[in-house]
Regions:
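N-terminal Rossmann-like dinucleotide-binding module
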Residues: 15-83, 164, 174, 255
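Glycine-centered tight turns that cap/initiate beta-strands
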Residues: 62, 86, 101, 178-181, ...
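N-terminal Rossmann-like NAD(P) cofactor-binding module of classical short-chain dehydrogenase/reductase
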Residues: 105-106
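N-terminal glycine-rich "phosphate-gripper" loop used for MgATP/nucleotide binding
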Residues: 109-112
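Contiguous beta-strand/loop segments that form the cofactor/metal-binding neighborhood of enzyme cores
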Residues: 169, 178-181, 186-188, 194-411, ...
Length: 444
């Protein structure tokens, strides 16, 4: 649905409906569960992200951790501290896959482990929650989609913007036509500190005794133990996907969700470089990408910067206004897309022609008696609950129980990851790239 203009009353009614009963929003709530509905999960990877997922998951009703696996022994201790002292822990993640009492896997492992983890989990009959980005490469993603579809198991990708209340409101407002014809979508995020640039301090006790370094490297060419690579793997393309896979994927996933897009971009062009963090990394710390999406070639411009602090934000532009989404706040700045006065070009008309034109213009465009004026002032609202990780994990565990679809399945996650891979490929190839659906490859 697309209206030519919206009055203030119409906008408030529509946005309230989109907000789900009130502009104030509603906090996330869980349904009551019987003890028989308890889901037992195995945790693979108890690092920075994994420890957070583990702690959040065990607080959800009807969810219990049956065991944890990590190649670094210090994280066995951490898992026991988070869950319980007698939690079974191991370096061998396959023990969790082989355990028939475990319903599903929550995995937070380096990107270069995602394909192996997903394929082996679903092949073992386990549903899996895999951290973003879904894949390390486009080819890995294709293989993962095939494996999940063949197995019939459930996969949820851990990019939580699709479970954000504020993104859901934006999605409904866009679907109702409040923005008119979409013209451009922008998204950005910036950080400006060592932690934000992944310069994490390696564990002081890291050694070949406390870490199975050889297995950690997976199928990447072997090298001697490097504690910085272990802690900062996101900085190297051999193990991670850089700002594209770690940060851009959130912007892309949220954009796909809000705009109702579930396909890879048609085209991508990137620029950037290592501008701030000259620490040996080979992934850019500044990365800007322009995409074209869909039949209308909608321009989408995304930029990431690890040298300047900027809040994560979207600016969705249309013929009837601009919608800005940041954190738990949404702001709509309406535009009529129409002249408010007769065109100043008529000043070049002779007097009689100008007077006649302007009289006719006012007759056709001035508000009539009883007609509501269009919305002109900016309107904002916020939600009180912005912890989108909880509902995202809850959606996964509910799907494990009920076998209903998840909000971010393997196809959605693959398409979001492809946008990130295209951003990286365009950057490293220094040319525009396209997605070739026939060969399922990125071409330039």
């Amino acid at each position: 649905m697309k209206k030519p203009t919206w009055s203030r009353r119409e906008f408030l009614e529509a946005s309230a409906a989109a907000a789900g009963v009130s502009l104030a929003g509603q906090p996330f709530k869980f349904r009551a569960l019987a003890p028989s509905d308890t889901v037992r999960f195995g945790m693979v990877g108890v690092g920075m992200q994994g420890s957070g997922l583990l702690g959040t998951s065990i607080q959800l009703p009807g969810v219990t951790c049956a065991g944890a696996a990590d190649l670094y022994d210090g994280r066995h201790t951490l898992a026991k501290e988070i869950v319980r002292p007698d939690l079974p822990t191991t370096r061998e993640y396959r023990r969790l896959l082989d355990d028939k009492t475990i319903d599903c896997i929550v995995a937070a492992v380096p990107d270069h482990w995602h394909r192996r983890m997903v394929v082996e989990a679903v092949s073992a009959g386990k549903d899996i929650y895999i951290e973003k980005p879904m894949s390390h490469t486009a080819a890995d993603g294709v293989a993962m989609v095939d494996a999940v579809k063949k197995s019939g198991r459930i996969l949820q990708v851990g990019s939580q913007r699709v479970s954000s209340q504020i993104c859901a409101k934006a999605k409904d407002m866009i679907a109702q036509g409040m923005l008119g014809d979409l013209t451009l979508v922008e998204g950005w995020l910036g950080r400006n500190d060592p932690t934000g640039a992944w310069e994490y301090p390696p564990p002081p006790d890291l050694s070949l005794k406390t870490l199975d370094w050889d297995t950690w490297q997976n199928d990447v060419p072997k090298r001697s133990l490097d504690p910085n690579i272990f802690a900062r793997w996101r900085c190297w393309k051999e193990y991670g996907t850089g700002v594209a896979g770690d940060l851009l994927v959130h912007l892309i996933s949220g954009m796909q969700f809000m705009l109702g897009i579930n396909e890879p971009p048609k085209q991508a062009a990137s620029m950037g470089g290592i501008r701030r963090w000259k620490d040996g990394r080979n992934m850019p710390d500044v990365h800007a990408t322009m995409y074209y999406y869909g039949a209308t070639d909608l321009p989408v411009y995304m930029r990431l910067n690890l040298g300047t602090e900027m809040p994560e934000q979207y600016r969705i532009q249309g013929s009837q206004g601009v919608l800005e989404v940041s954190g738990n706040t949404l702001t709509f700045s309406p535009q009529t897309g129409k002249d408010q006065w007769p065109s100043y070009y008529t000043g070049s008309y002779p007097h009689a022609l100008r007077e006649a034109y302007q009289a006719q213009w006012h007759k056709e465009h001035d508000l009539q008696a009883g007609q509501a004026p269009p919305l002109t002032e900016t309107v904002s609202f916020s939600t009180p609950d912005f912890d989108d990780t909880r509902p995202h994990l809850w959606n996964f565990f509910e799907a494990v129980r009920t076998r209903k679809p998840v909000v971010e399945d393997v196809v959605f996650g693959h398409n979001a990851a492809l946008a990130c891979h295209m951003a990286n490929e365009a950057y490293f190839r220094r040319t525009t790239v396209t997605w070739d659906e026939a060969t399922k490859t990125i071409r330039s």
